[in-house]
Amino acid sequence: MLKRIINKIKYHLIKEIVLVDSENIGYQIPEEIPKHTLVYLFISDPYIDEKIKDYKNNKHIKLINISNIRKECVTKNIMDFCIVAELTNLLSYVSKKTKIVICSKDRGYDASILYLKEKYPKQLVSRHPGSFCYYYNEGNEDYLSIMSKINDSLRKKVLSYTCMDSLKNALNYLL
């Protein structure tokens, strides 16, 4: 009970929580995240340190490493179950005004989201069928225009960079 009260206090300023299914959409997270947004990046790869090193000290990103669970329970959809469990946990203490989004192409989340919407009709829960970068930049016309004009290979390469400086260095190296 005390932990729930502490979490309610801790999360009262959060307006949006994004749960990222990295197995499905990757590890790409924009450098700048709005101050009232919290990102839960679920990770199952035990050898991922290099890709996520920039996220470790970011107060807007919580890294949820489930690689130990994956070792113990070799079954399909482990990450999906962990994300839905965390979503259910979050619903117990976040404000009803807090928007919670799962970023994943996996439609399997839709049934869980529908069930939770019926159980908690005032909660704002949804799934975005793409990467967090696309979700976050969805309204940015310049970003969408540029990304729509590049091929899949280059798009994946651009989205793999977590820091604009490293992307600029890589592009300068190519030129």
Regions found by a protein language model. Give the residues of each.
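Charged, flexible boundary elements
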Residues: 1-7, 82
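Short boundary motifs at domain starts and secondary-structure transition points
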Residues: 5-12, 30-31
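N-terminal start-of-chain detector that recognizes signal peptides
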Residues: 10-15, 73
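A general structural motif
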Residues: 13-15, 36-38, 95-99
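Short, hydrophobic beta-strand segments that form beta-sheet elements in well-ordered domains
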Residues: 16-22, 38-46, 102
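Short acidic, Gly/Ser-rich segments with clustered Asp/Glu that frequently serve as metal-coordination loops
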Residues: 22-30
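Short, glycine/acidic-enriched capping/hinge loops at junctions between secondary-structure elements
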Residues: 29-32, 52-53
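Nuclease catalytic cores that cleave nucleic-acid phosphodiester bonds
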Residues: 45-173
